[in-house]
Amino acid sequence: MSKDIRVRYAPSPTGVVHIGNARTALFNYLYARHHGGTFLIRIEDTDRKRHVEDGERSQLENLRWLGMDWDESPESHENYRQSERLDLYQKYIDQLLAEGKAYKSYVTEEELAAERERQEAAGETPRYINEYLGMSEEEKAAYIAEREAAGIIPTVRLAVNESGIYKWHDMVKGDIEFEGGNIGGDWVIQKKDGYPTYNFAVVIDDHDMQISHVIRGDDHIANTPKQLMVYEALGWEAPEFGHMTLIINSETGKKLSKRDTNTLQFIEDYRKKGYLPEAVFNFIALLGWNPGGEDEIFSREELIKLFDENRLSKSPAAFDQKKLDWMSNDYIKNADLETIFEMAKPFLEEAGRLTDKAEKLVELYKPQMKSVDEIIPLTDLFFSDFPELTEAEREVMTGETVPTVLEAFKAKLEAMTDDEFVTENIFPQIKAVQKETGIKGKNLFMPIRIAVSGEMHGPELPDTIFLLGREKSIQHIENILKEISK
């Protein structure tokens, strides 16, 4: 590429990182790392209503958990928070006022609301109409004096070129253009409290920080013409823009909503449930981008190497919780036991299950986990009464050979000494039951599995029986025999 790549992720300090925000950060990160560019983080904290105590630290922690690093941020650079840059914004506000490209507006909220109501009643598209329209210089001066005497604090509006055409070649969408007359009239660049509006401040920040490419969600497309107006007014070259498609719920086909209860949408949720960050990183990287081919499991280094902005999708990205869980399970299965056991310890400790057999239980159930917190329901069998059987399990236990199998296997367990009761000796006892009864296959194994574990599927049966213990295994079999004899 001909120019240095500098991209940014600019969140508000709300604390939570939504999956959509995480994707924005991640695509900027991949783009910068692939091209050997700079990835920076800037905090947009001028909207004090959205400010959350400790929100900035939480944002950065969640990004670090995902596996991202950055070159510049408020941690290492001064004035990387918008609240620290108010003097800079004021400098350019004053410049635009002096050049007649912006003006102070004294119209009140009540007057704006009344005008909007009138326009809507007349079937007109709501827009701001310059309050000074048709005034002579004397009338304008008198109007301003009257408003200031009434204590009305002005906003500052950018004077829009209504005949201008604002267009750009989008990295994702292709050519896009807006007419200046269709963006709602002269718009506010500085609020009454002296703070800049988003579309003004972001231009000053991106120019000052030499941002080369702005990669963000397509909900920002409507903001882009306003930002181009500011670039034009200040005589600056705009960066390249790329607007990623919406993320939709794969089940509803609609835009992902915080009300969708069938999905986990915040990075903090994945951290708390014990997903591996590598799995979440991998999944998010494929939301609206793919490297081609059939493979879906990639390391961070592979994703950096493969990332190609030309393969960003023009179609909405489907968020599929089941696919994420499949991917997460693959990562957990292939992770080393020590890593997963360390992640499982807090869950086990809270449940009072951090026993001498805890690590073996984690090893046993690791292949089944989608998230590490599942170690608790998966191991309920070992720490609670025998579970209620499902209809399908009850159906299996009505087989006429079931009592024969269970009585024979119970006798084998009762005959074993404590020293003999080890994992490698359990399977031969099952085979001995087969030899004695002539019953084999699922008619042999399924009744034993259901009687011992209360489940039709699970880890290797000898492992389950050993960890459950000889006495508890015998007790479970006796309980089932009583149940099926009724």
Curated annotation (Swiss-Prot):
The keyword Aminoacyl-tRNA synthetase applies. Its EC number is 6.1.1.17. InterPro entries: aa-tRNA-synth_I_cd-bd, aa-tRNA-synth_I_codon-bd_sub2, aa-tRNA-synth_I_CS, aa_tRNA-synth_I_cd-bd_sf, Glu-tRNA-ligase_bac/mito, Glu/Gln-tRNA-synth, Glu/Gln-tRNA-synth_Ib_cat-dom, GluQ/Sye. A motif ('KMSKS' region) lies at residues 255-259. It is an enzyme of class 6 (ligase). A motif ('HIGH' region) lies at residues 11-21. Keywords: Aminoacyl-tRNA synthetase, ATP-binding, Cytoplasm, Ligase, Nucleotide-binding, Protein biosynthesis. Gene3D superfamilies: 1.10.10.350, HUPs. GO terms for biological process: glutamyl-tRNA aminoacylation. CDD domains: GluRS_core. GO terms for cellular component: cytosol. It comes from the Bacteria. ATP binds at K258. PROSITE patterns: AA_TRNA_LIGASE_I. The keyword Ligase applies. It catalyses: tRNA(Glu) + L-glutamate + ATP = L-glutamyl-tRNA(Glu) + AMP + diphosphate. Monomer. Belongs to the class-I aminoacyl-tRNA synthetase family. Glutamate--tRNA ligase type 1 subfamily. HAMAP family: Glu_tRNA_synth_type1. Catalyzes the attachment of glutamate to tRNA(Glu) in a two-step reaction: glutamate is first activated by ATP to form Glu-AMP and then transferred to the acceptor end of tRNA(Glu). This is Glutamate--tRNA ligase. It comes from Streptococcus pneumoniae (strain CGSP14).
